[in-house]
Structures are given as C-alpha cells and as structure tokens.
C-alpha cells in the first residue's frame, strides 16, 4: 500500500463514533450514519476496504479535495481514519438524503424548487472551479439535502485538480447519462475542462423535472455512441407547456454542445431562472414536508398516465380441483380416459420409478438438441400413466382405493365415473422384478414391491374372494433412451385463458415456479407446494411474459404496453395484500417510485408482439417489440438489471403479424427480426423476410406468399432454426439453407400440426387432438398421444395448454421432463380426467 496522507489517523473510528445504520454505497465504498460519542453530533462515515497492493492515491485525492474545500454548498470534511485495511472518511451528515432519494418518493420538483437547487449547485461549482477543481459527476444522487433544507455537493470520488498543465483532462470518467459530449469523445477531441460540470447540471435539471435523465432507457454504450456523432442534438424538456420560457432557456444554455460557447458557473448565476426573487430554503423545506407526509400531496403515478385498474372478476387464489404431488405426479384418474397411445419403433421401455427426482436448473439453450440425441439416460416414464396396445397389455392392476379400509372395497370396485378402469392403461412401479410367481402376503404383511409410500393407485386391497393378488408385470429389458414423461399434470380445472408462460426459480427457497400470462392477469404456480394453487400477481390482461434474473417482462394492459416487474416485489405485495385485505388500489398510488415493482417501458404503448433471443457471448439477451409503425430492440444490461433500448427502426409491419421472431447468426452483433417466411429458391429451403437493425436501411422480402396452415419460426441453436410451414417442419440455418449433418432436414407432418417445440433433442408437434414426438433430423415418428375429446393448444413456441372440447376449464401439464426448467416453461392442460 502506498504511503498514506499524514493527516489520516491510524486508529479505529469506532472509538470516536457509534455506527447507527448503513445509508448506501458510494463510488468506492459504503456510507454509514454515525454519532460522535463526545458531542452527540451526527456524521456520515464513508468506509473503503483496502488491499495491500491498492493504490490509495485516488482516495487521497478525494480527501485532499474535501480538506481544502470550505463552502456552504459543499459537504464539510471532519477527518479520516485508516484501520485494519479500511479507510474511513468522516464528513457532514445530510439527513434528508440525496435529491434522487427525495424525488423517487415525492415525484418531480416544482420549477421554483429546481431553480433554487440549480442556484445552490452553481454557487458550489463556481467555488470549485475557482479552486481549479472539476467535480465531473454532477447528478441528483450526488446532491444532498440536510434537515435545514440546505443543498450540498458530495461524492468527490472522481473529482480532479485543474493545474496549469492539467487544464484539459484526458480521462474518460463520469456517468454516461449526465456526461458532456466532449467527455464522451475525449479520445477524439483531446480533452475537456470544468465546463463539463455545467452540462451535467443542465441534465440534472431535466432529471429533477422528469424523474430521470434523457435517454435513460437507452443502453449507456449506445448513449456514448450517440453523443459522439456529429449530428447529435442536445436534449430538451419534453413538455413545453409545463415549464416557463426561462427554464427552457436555462436548459438550452447549459446544454450548449460546444464547450467553447458554454457559459461558466459564475456567468450562469446571473441567469433569469436562478436570479429571480423568492428562491429560499423554504421551497426545499416544503419538499421535505412532502417527503415525510407523502399522503398530503398528489400521487406521483407513473411517467405516463395509468389506465384505471378495476377489481378483477376472478379470485386471486385458485386451487386445483384435485391435489397433486409437489413433484408433478399425475392424478391416478388420468388412467380413466381412453387415449390412443401408439408405441412405435425403437420405443421399448422399462417400468419407471414411482417418484420423480428434482433436477438442478438447466438452461434450455445451453444444451444442443443434436448432442442430446447421442446421450443416454436411465430416466423413464416415472411420472405418467402409459397407455399401451392391447396385445402388449400386462395383467391389469386393481382400481385405485379411495383411502377407505380394505374391507370397504372389493375387487370389482368402480372408478369415480362409475366405470371400471380400462385394462388398456397401466401404471408401473419401481422395484425388483419377481423371479417366479408366488403367493401374496397376508393383509397384515407389506408387499415386497408396494409400500405405504407407493402411489395409492398401485395398492392392491386384500380380497376375500382371491387367494393371491395379481402380480406386477415383470421388468422388460432396459433400452437406453433420452426422455421422460410426455405430459405431467400440475393443475386441475384451470379457469384462466392463458396466453404465455415463463419459468422462474426463487433465489432463496429454490422453489420452481410457473408464471402465467392470461386474460385475467399474471398468475404464479409454485410447483413445490403440496396443493397446487394459482395466485394472482398483476391484475391486468397479459399476452406475453419472459423472466430473467428475478425480473419479469410482460406485455400487459387493455392497450398493450411493455412492463418490467420485480418478481420478488410482486410476491411481497401479494403477501401484504393477503395479510391486510383492502379495496383494490393501483400499486402506483401506494408505493414510492423507487419501490415500484411494476413499471412501464417508455415508448412501447400499443406493442403488438414481443420476442427474445440470446445475445452475443459478451452481452445479454435481446428483446424485440413490434409497435404500430416501428420495431424496437432492447438488450439486457446486467449492471442496471434491466432492458435498455439499443435500436429503433421505423417500419410499417404487416397485419396480421403471423410471424415475429429474432434470428441471430454467428458473428453478428445485432439480431434480425423475422416478420415472414416463404419457400426458398434452389439451395435454400426457406426465405426469411427480415428487418435488420445493423444496416442503414432494413430489407424485406416479398410478403405476398399465402400459407396452408399455421406458420412458426423458432431458433433452437445458433446455427439452427425450426420452421413450421405448409404442413412440414424444416430445420434450416439462419440464412435459410438446410442444416448440414441431418438425414432429413424436412419432416412432413401426418396431422394438421399447429405448433412445434424442441424438447430434449426431440421434436414435439402439437395438433388439435394430440401430440407427436419426432426424432430430430429424421422422419421417424417416435411417439404419439391422441384423444378426440381433448383440444391441445401451444402457448407460445415452447408452451402447451390442453383443454376439453366443451369445457372452458383446463388442466395444466408439462411436456417432457417434469422437473427440468426447460420443460417448466411448457405448460399443458386436460379437462375431464
């Protein structure tokens, strides 16, 4: 560690101060509220952890600036301590917090309040600049207010001396949204001076008026790129009629693009906005009173007008009509439906285990379907009743007991529907196969194959008429195969009209959940609960959902709008509402803005459709939205835990929009959005009609093609796109060429397939009355489930719902493995089982 300033005390600051609470984090460390043990005065202690090889020159610079700055608008410095590899900086405590903390509760400041703040900040900047210092990070979060309503500049972690040889800084530092153009282009233009603080003050004035700086929903790297362009226009206030001409002029002058023409802090103090009479601390005291009593003032609402939220007509909690296992084991009465389930070539299986095993979460796209084809697994149908052809049917098991004593039922017991369970359906249990037939045990003795923990439908109630109970069928020879249950029931009697689903794992409990976007709102289903229950999270029509990093994106509202929700916040609000039921009030009327769990994404009103694709290896996933006259592309930005705007292309989309999917190619920085597909030319299986974001102008193919039946485009790998078109499924590259290495890149469907999904390296095709499973890259039909009394519907590309042809209610099922997150986002349902 470098030599520390001699004025830094080498002792524990806690000998002099009592730490009261953590206030937050600064540029280099954490900030605590503390009390002087002698005087009782409150102070702020900034703690920075040090490493032996750390260069403390930057921190010494901050300390030096604080020590040498004595001004009414700059936080006072009280001393520094170095103890146990931690540097503590003691400074003035501002009890009201930062302006950012304040406006997130109170809403935007009035023009007079903004004028007073700007005047006080300009006075502090004029002093700093006279001392040859630049702040370089002026923003709402670094402007503090004390309990007396006084304004203080804080956080000098990136301040710099302006010496005779350092008049032009050559470092790239600051916050992009508040950054001056010359700072963003420092590598091109050669440096900047103290006037960059004037630009930041102008952006801060807009922030206080509009609750966020301009371009705040745009990716920060995109903001830097825009500011370095020659055609960049400085931002202005959005609502011209709301603010005075003096305020508009103040913004125009402070945001002068050329630093040579931008006025200094001293000159700006004579501006009409900040020199008007009536600017005093009373304006800020009124703001603090509103902060302490938010109910007195008007509600802050959202950035845009909220649609009126009406009490939902559907209950907030919906219980399954039958209890189901937390592992998703199907109800035993599933066996009572006459499903035709054809065993096709290569599908001999062994009897499965009678319990499911939870698997660790896995990303669907992290495993290649083609690689999965060559893998082997001992997992079998451990969660489903398997109908088989009559000629292969083993002796039937007795009917399921209804948890009555054995003497209450005989061997001829009837099912719930008054009919004997069909013998064509069987359920297998785990256990060693019998070596030879032998008499069954007496009623008081447990079966070697069935125990009290076995599935109730497998129990064999003792009979007074039979000498021995029927034996379980012997195990067949194991055939190594990939896959598990085709459908696993999760919920019975779902009344929701579901449009989309997403999977989510709770970060603390690790419980797996399903998030459902429906006409009635957003609901959640905990797959680990003993009793399946759907609980409402958001009472607004939702047609699309997607979860990432505990954030739920949704397309919600009567007029569709893209929303961002905190899933943990939605759950907490649900529990609060359940514990204290009150009249339905929009959450925006109850919560501070910083605590809002549901916020609208700006400029996405009227969004027609959304889709998501994985980003490049260095970036997060992309989200694309189809607006009325344009297409917007957003990308996940991990430091801010949100999607930010990357590009927007003005383009009139077709109506109806039958295809809307993102396509990413190897080496491409930005994806293209596919809005149509047609048969290809020689050498190409299909021709994608795309809108490209990277080119100067977008390209669109001929859109006059009419298709026979549904059309679907889904990218399943970086170099593989699955296209359902004209009754067949084609596996092509993002350019439309057939995928190499596949025996059959085009699979003709034998039914009127409406949607397809890739599950566990196999192709699942869903049609009106059934499901087909095809081998990837071949015309081999591996498995089929059909029932003319049921209607299946795929929710999105990898999601399934199945309902009765008459009843509007449905049961939720999972296709594929019952516990993998890949199958967790595929939901199905069956009625009348």
From Swiss-Prot:
InterPro entries, sorted: CNH_dom, Kinase-like_dom_sf, MAPKKKK, Prot_kinase_dom, Protein_kinase_ATP_BS, STE20/SPS1-PAK
Modified residues (Phosphothreonine): 165, 175, 355
Residue ranges, compositional bias (Pro residues): 431-445
Residues annotated as domain Protein kinase: 17-274
Pfam families for this protein: CNH (PF00780), Pkinase (PF00069)
Known function: Serine/threonine-protein kinase, which plays a role in the response to environmental stress. Appears to act upstream of the JUN N-terminal pathway. Activator of the Hippo signaling pathway which plays a pivotal role in organ size control and tumor suppression by restricting proliferation and promoting apoptosis. MAP4Ks act in parallel to and are partially redundant with STK3/MST2 and STK4/MST2 in the phosphorylation and activation of LATS1/2, and establish MAP4Ks as components of the expanded Hippo pathway. May play a role in hematopoietic lineage decisions and growth regulation.
Protein name: Mitogen-activated protein kinase kinase kinase kinase 1
Species per Swiss-Prot/TrEMBL record: Homo sapiens (Human)
Taxonomic classification: Eukaryota, Metazoa, Chordata, Craniata, Vertebrata
